[in-house]
UniProtKB/Swiss-Prot annotation:
This is Prepro-urotensin II-gamma. Belongs to the urotensin-2 family. Residues 1-21 form the signal peptide. GO terms for cellular component: extracellular region. Transmembrane segments: none annotated. It is found in: Secreted. One of its GO terms (biological process) is blood vessel diameter maintenance. Residues 109-111 form a propeptide.
């Protein structure tokens, strides 16, 4: 028993020694030396891209074997729902919005017990 305790403490101390070897820096003393704005960082404005640039990037991605995030036929971001699909979902197939009954759990009715059972609400003794 004492051997297990001693072994556990030594393993704990050995594992903590690696953590104590790293210096702890206070972030209040550190200064941010990055650019103050996007223009200074050399970022690209999304309005600067044209459709030809986008097609060029898509072709490069297709050659590299990546699946493009944008489709070339109709440029759209995945996750956006077209109006026709939204209309179909809301008007024509409203049952798709209701989750299956199993997710909410069953709502079976509790019947009263006959006899001299002491019951409070639905719990009987």
């Amino acid at each position: 028993m004492m051997c297990n305790l001693l072994l556990s403490c030594s393993v704990l101390l050995l594992s903590c020694s690696h953590l104590l070897a790293h210096p702890v820096t206070d972030t209040a003393d550190m200064t941010y030396s990055g650019p103050d704005s996007v223009e200074e960082a050399g970022g690209v404005n999304p309005d600067d891209f044209s459709v030809s640039d986008l097609n060029e990037h898509l072709q490069r991605a297709a050659v590299a074997g990546y699946s493009p995030l944008f489709s070339q036929e109709n440029i759209k971001v995945p996750g956006q729902i077209p109006k026709e699909a939204l209309r179909e979902l809301l008007l024509e197939k409203p049952y798709r919005l209701i989750p299956p009954r199993g997710l909410w759990g069953s709502r079976r009715q509790f019947r009263k017990r006959g006899g001299g059972a002491d019951c409070f609400w639905k719990y009987c003794i």
